[in-house]
Structure formats: structure tokens, C-alpha cells
Curated annotation (Swiss-Prot):
Gene3D superfamilies: Farnesyl Diphosphate Synthase. It catalyses: (2E,6E)-farnesyl diphosphate + H2O = (+)-corvol ether B + diphosphate; (2E,6E)-farnesyl diphosphate + H2O = (+)-corvol ether A + diphosphate. Binds 3 Mg(2+) ions per subunit. Substrate binds at residue 184. This is Sesquiterpene synthase MAC_05714. Terpene synthase that catalyzes the conversion of (2E,6E)-farnesyl diphosphate (FPP) into sesquiterpenes which are important for fungi-environment interactions. Produces a mixture consisting of 8 sesquiterpenes including corvol ethers A and B, as well as traces of epizonarene, gamma-cadinene, delta-cadinene, alpha-cadinene, alpha-cadinol, and an unidentified sesquiterpene. Produces both corvol ether A and corvol ether B in similar concentrations. A motif (DDXXXD motif) lies at residues 91-96. It comes from Metarhizium acridum (strain CQMa 102). One of its GO terms (molecular function) is terpene synthase activity. Keywords: Lyase, Magnesium, Metal-binding.
Length: 349
């Protein structure tokens, strides 16, 4: 009933545009990175059929990387673009666009954690496991050890908080806003992305600066801005998903608001968070700080602006015309995993 009620109203949804104070940026390597990303995804058997290939082509994950990391060196930018295509496809097939929980859910998610903890794949890898191992090994080589561990911890939390998201969707009604926010900031996968912001700007922020309360608050605000905006932008697609569909907008509706009111409330929260981010960023960067911290804050700004521009100008991931074909991946998720993982790369246990 919860989903059916929203489906009947969703055609009237008007997605707001968010105004960002700093200019658009994009790496000049965008096109070549996108092309190589597609070849890499092919090599690792991530594009499971022609329909999936078409979906990835029109989604433009390489351009998301190019917008969010405009100053990254070519090797790191390529690794990030490959990570993006892997992450979005794995997230869809493991959690979002399949049944709330399946016989393979635990095996799939623990395999991703194992790659981080053991630096090897299993003897019988699940979908995307060898691709994930390849990304992690490349990032280990490209990043400082602590920087890689920040990325890895963010991904461990993505895999583990997915269980909380699943539990929430097994309840008759969603948890409240505060509980949802705690889950959302980790299932989004954004913390691993922001952990790369300094390296992508040719810096390596030190721990004593990275873990300052105000710096961590900027990281949280970046996460909130992107996630809450995405809750509006992806609502039309997500409400049609068989698995995960509850988000900030639907929870406000559950609390008694109309769809229009819930979107307005969420929009206001995004704009308020954006305003607070700008004020705090000015405070953090006003005194004499290291160049590494300064470029890290710049990297957070690139992520906010880059994501928003990607949604408006580049991607069709949330396009209404593809909802019917893209929202439900249950038929894809039941394909024989052994067929999806025949790849010539990497070691296994």
C-alpha cells in the first residue's frame, strides 16, 4: 500500500534544481576515462547483457568521476571511474533493485568485505568480486596507506549498514528520520568517495587535520547534501524498485506530509545544509592551514558540484523514460554467478 499510494502520485513530481556557489569543473580526461571504463567493465563481465550495457553507457559513470575529481591524475581518475561503475552495478544487484533479501545477500556482501580484509577473492567469486579486487589493489598502490584505509572503512560500513537498510524494509513502516539518516550516510557509499578527495587533488591530508571535528563535520555535511538531494532525484526510479525504496521523502510522507510537502521539506534541508557547509568551509580555511587540508576542502566542494552537474547534464540513471526497464533487476540477479565472473584477472584463495 505504501508504494502503490506513491506510484499514483509520482508523475506529478517536480525535481528541484540546487544552486551551488562555486563553478563547474570537469577533467579534460573525461572522454578517454569513460571509454576505458567501459572496456574494463567488459573485461570483468560486469555488463551482463546488452540491456545492461546500454544502461551503463547512458549513465556516464566516467563523467561523474571527471566532475567530482577534476584535478586527479589519469591513473587515479581511471581507478575511480572503474570503482564507480562497479559500485553502482553491485549496489543495484546486491541491494537496491532486487528482492529485499535473497539467498545470496549475505554471501555477496561478505565477499566485498573479505576483499578489503584479505586482499584476495574467494575460490568461487560472486558477481563483481574480481573487479572489486582489481579496484582495491590499484587504489592500494596509488594511495597512502592511511588514505586507503579510510576508503576501505567506508566500504566496510556500506556493506554492513546494508543489513540495517534491509531490516528497515522488512518492517511494516520505516524507522524515523534520525535513524534513517544514520543508515543513509553509509549505504550511499559517499564516505569512500570523499576519502579520495585529497589524493585526487594531489595532496594527502594528515590524520591530525583530517579528524578535526570541523573537518569531519564538513564531510558529514557533504554526505548529507548529496544523499538528501539524491533522495528527491531518484525517487521516481526507487519507488518502482522491488527492494529498497524508502528514503527521506517517503518517511516525511509516512509522517503525514503530502508528496509535494515532503519534497519541499527535503529540499529545504538540502539548502540549509549547503548554507551551513559554505559557512563552515570558510571558517576551516580562513586560518593558516596546510595545502593538503585546503585541497581536501576543495575536493568536498568538487563532489557536491560535480554530483549535481552530473544529474542535471550527463546521466540518465534517474530518467523517467527508463524507469520501466531499469528499476527491477531481479531477472539479472538470478543469472548463474559462474558465468558473470569468468575473468582473467587476479588471484583467488
Amino acid at each position: 500500500m505504501e508504494k502503490q499510494h506513491l506510484k499514483s502520485q509520482i508523475a506529478a513530481l517536480r525535481v528541484p534544481t540546487f544552486n551551488i556557489a562555486w563553478p563547474e569543473r570537469r577533467s579534460p580526461k573525461a572522454d578517454v576515462v569513460e571509454e576505458r571504463m567501459m572496456k574494463w567493465a567488459d573485461h570483468h563481465k560486469l555488463l551482463v547483457n546488452g540491456e545492461y550495457r546500454d544502461r551503463v553507457i547512458r549513465t556516464r559513470y566516467g563523467l561523474l568521476a571527471a566532475r567530482c575529481y577534476p584535478n586527479a591524475g589519469e591513473e587515479l581518475l581511471q581507478a575511480i571511474a572503474d570503482y564507480f561503475v562497479w559500485f553502482f552495478l553491485a549496489d543495484d544487484l546486491f541491494v537496491d533493485r532486487v528482492e529485499v533479501v535473497t539467498d545470496e545477500t549475505i554471501r555477496n556482501l561478505t565477499a566485498m568485505i573479505d576483499v578489503l580484509d584479505r586482499n584476495v577473492a574467494r575460490e568461487e567469486p560472486v558477481f563483481g568480486e574480481l573487479a572489486w579486487l582489481d579496484v582495491c589493489q590499484r587504489l592500494r598502490d596509488l594511495l597512502q596507506p592511511e588514505a586507503f584505509q579510510r576508503f576501505a572503512q567506508g566500504m566496510r560500513l556500506w556493506a554492513t549498514t546494508a543489513a540495517l537498510q534491509i531490516l528497515n524494509h522488512q518492517r511494516p513502516k520505516s524507522v524515523g528520520i534520525r535513524e534513517y539518516e544514520a543508515i543513509r550516510r553509509h549505504t550511499s557509499g559517499l564516505n569512500p568517495c570523499t576519502s579520495l578527495a585529497d589524493a585526487a587533488n594531489k595532496g594527502s591530508v594528515q590524520a591530525h587535520e583530517f579528524y578535526q571535528p570541523d573537518v569531519q563535520k564538513l564531510v558529514l555535511q557533504t554526505n548529507n547534501i548529496v544523499c538528501w538531494a539524491n533522495d528527491i532525484q531518484s525517487l521516481g526510479m526507487e519507488i518502482q524498485q522491488p527492494g529498497q525504496f524508502r528514503n527521506m521523502v517517503t518517511i516525511y510522507i509516512q509522517q503525514g506530509q503530502s508528496l509535494s510537502e515532503a519534497v519541499s521539506t527535503t529540499t529545504a534541508r538540502v539548502n540549509n545544509e549547503l548554507s551551513d557547509f559554505c559557512k563552515l568551509a570558510d571558517i576551516v580555511t580562513a586560518p593558516s592551514i596546510s595545502d593538503e587540508l585546503r585541497v581536501y576542502v576543495d575536493g568536498l566542494k568538487y563532489w557536491i558540484r560535480g554530483y549535481m552537474d552530473w544529474v542535471v547534464h550527463d546521466t540518465e540513471r534517474y530518467a523517467d523514460k527508463f524507469i520501466a526497464s531499469d528499476a527491477d533487476d531481479r531477472c539479472v540477479s538470478t543469472l548463474n554467478p559462474s558465468l558473470l565472473n569468468r575473468s582473467s584477472s587476479s588471484a583467488t584463495e
